[in-house]
Amino acid sequence: MTLTKRIIPCIDVDVDENGDAAVYTGVNFEDLEYTGDPVEMAKAYNESGADEFVFLDITASAEGRETMLDTVSAVADEVFIPLTVGGGIRTRADIKETLRAGADKVSINSGAIAEPDLINEGAAAFGSQCIVISVDARRRFDSEGEHYTEVDGESCWFECTVKGGREGTGLDVIEWATEAEERGAGELFVNSIDADGTKDGYDIPLMKAVCDTVSTPVIASSGCGSPEDMEEVFVDAGADAGLAASIFHFGEYSIAETKEYLDSKGIPVRL
């Protein structure tokens, strides 16, 4: 049986100047602009035909604070499709509290790189299906990597970054994806700093490299500018889900239009 490809909208949430949760959109993890209210946007996406929904607290890890659980709870009250929440999750207790607030899955990046055993502990306590390992990847054109890919005629490797892309780790994405899968991650959520917000398409070399390495489902993120970009990441890279933000936030394409296009190309989606 062919599994359907999932279409997933995502909101990047930060604290605004009044201390309230707000959705922001940026480019290359920078130049953030106010986009809307997280609860209202969640409600709209719940009714849009989305397969899942992702809520990312984009500064919790960098600022060393806890995830906005009150906002997560308010969003969960409006969302009746699987909800993944990420940002600031560092401990088993954080996982438990985030799930208790209404998340179906947690997305962990910096916390898992700092304490890889958190993946094992989370999978054992809550089930692998709850543990999504997020990777913020950045291209590097030097000799310090483990696994190299041809990109625009040059050889590059992909580095894991942490704290919202602010810090490099020296850790090769392919090595980390393999380890995360072995430790019990139920999904991999792969972001590209180079493609983020550009609407020029997903980072296909990155996504293909990860998809070719692991059997765990891969959510492709960053760079989607059209339904054609989703077709490309499904067909050419082998991703299991396509995540997008700005093209949906600003009404450039609807989720229904995206699914209809993919269906017309023979890509299995839930209509």
From Swiss-Prot:
CDD domains, per database record: HisF
Pfam families linked: His_biosynth
GO molecular function, one term: imidazoleglycerol-phosphate synthase activity
Catalytic activity, as annotated: 5-[(5-phospho-1-deoxy-D-ribulos-1-ylimino)methylamino]-1-(5-phospho-beta-D-ribosyl)imidazole-4-carboxamide + L-glutamine = D-erythro-1-(imidazol-4-yl)glycerol 3-phosphate + 5-amino-1-(5-phospho-beta-D-ribosyl)imidazole-4-carboxamide + L-glutamate + H(+)
Pathway note: Amino-acid biosynthesis; L-histidine biosynthesis; L-histidine from 5-phospho-alpha-D-ribose 1-diphosphate: step 5/9
InterPro entries: Aldolase_TIM, His_biosynth, HisF, IGPS_HisA/HisF, RibuloseP-bd_barrel
Top-rank EC class of the record's enzyme: lyase
Gene3D superfamilies per UniProt: Aldolase class I
GO cellular component: a single term: cytoplasm
Keyword Lyase found: yes
The protein's Enzyme Commission number: 4.3.2.10
Active site: D12, D136
Protein location: Cytoplasm
Any single GO BP term: L-histidine biosynthetic process
Family statement: Belongs to the HisA/HisF family.
NCBIfam families reported in the protein's UniProt record: hisF
Subunit structure comment from the entry: Heterodimer of HisH and HisF.
Role summary: IGPS catalyzes the conversion of PRFAR and glutamine to IGP, AICAR and glutamate. The HisF subunit catalyzes the cyclization activity that produces IGP and AICAR from PRFAR using the ammonia provided by the HisH subunit.
HAMAP family: HisF
Protein name: Imidazole glycerol phosphate synthase subunit HisF
Organism field: Haloarcula marismortui (strain ATCC 43049 / DSM 3752 / JCM 8966 / VKM B-1809)
